[in-house]
């Protein structure tokens, strides 16, 4: 099966040398909960979404989940921008992590994407 990873823009943020803060589910959900809390407190909206065949569904499989009502769920990671104070921050979060065999491809897409905004 051919793999793919795509980032879809929702809006173009204005950022100045931002820092990337990633919070994905893992041991204890500490990173995920922290980033989600900050996103909620700062009332941020996503500016981009990453979709990939390397992101797992909630049951650990990959692909598309089709609900009983015919709607579907495709796993994604979301980017949020905070530019009210310095340093500007790009938050990355989602409900899943990349597969072991796809983590480098997804990481490469994420890093290439945030470097366009000046992240180092």
Model-derived features: positions:
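N-terminal short beta-loop-beta anion/metal-coordinating cradle
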Residues: 1-95
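Internal, conserved structured core segments that host functional sites
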Residues: 87, 95-120
